[in-house]
């Protein structure tokens, strides 16, 4: 069994000011939620801005995991894929887009949120190209578990996550191992 590398990101895109108060999540709330799962003992690659980098490093250091934390600082998030944010903003004002929305004020209707969501794939690829990943990789949303909705005991995260992620298919005559 091999250790899994975790990859995440955090950028304050203004969710603390969302119109729908039930969907608001301030930067501090995200950091509080991260404190719960930050104790997972795996190597963690975090994409964030310089303002948040020290906070994130400090949280991981509280659990003795500073050496297993790799911070990639990006202060120009919306310039990584030039022209994408303006396109998302244009779409967000399109009447067909607006009529399609079940919750008009949902986070997924925010062009910055959509841009950041798309960047998960960009960051995973970037971490791969930088040689930061083990063979087994998991994306963890920074606000995972929303502060204890599913796992009420934060100590549930105090472990080294290892898993044999090789996929096995069993057929009546043979077994195929995909690596």
Segments from the language model and where they lie:
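Active-site-proximal specificity loops/subdomain of glycosyltransferases
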Residues: 63-132
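Well-ordered, non-membrane alpha-helical segments in soluble/globular domains
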Residues: 20-34, 152-160
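Short internal beta-strands
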Residues: 45-49
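Short, acidic, metal-binding catalytic loop of nucleotide-sugar glycosyltransferases
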Residues: 27-43, 62
């Amino acid at each position: 069994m091999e250790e899994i590398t975790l990859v995440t990101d955090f950028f304050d895109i203004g969710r603390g000011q969302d119109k729908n108060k039930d969907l608001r999540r301030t930067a501090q709330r995200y950091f509080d939620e991260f404190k719960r799962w930050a104790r997972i003992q795996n190597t963690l690659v975090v994409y964030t801005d310089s303002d948040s980098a020290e906070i994130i490093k400090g949280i991981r250091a509280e659990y003795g995991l500073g050496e297993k934390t790799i911070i990639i600082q990006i202060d120009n998030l919306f310039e990584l894929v030039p022209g994408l944010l303006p396109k998302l903003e244009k779409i967000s004002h399109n009447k067909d887009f607006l009529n399609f929305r079940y919750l008009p004020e949902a986070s997924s209707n925010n062009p910055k949120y959509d841009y950041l969501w798309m960047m998960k794939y960009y960051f995973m690829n970037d971490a791969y190209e930088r040689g930061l990943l083990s063979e087994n990789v998991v994306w963890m949303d920074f606000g995972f578990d929303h502060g204890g909705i599913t796992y009420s005991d934060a100590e549930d995260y105090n472990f080294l996550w290892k898993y044999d992620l090789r996929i096995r298919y069993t057929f009546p005559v043979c077994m195929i191992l995909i690596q």
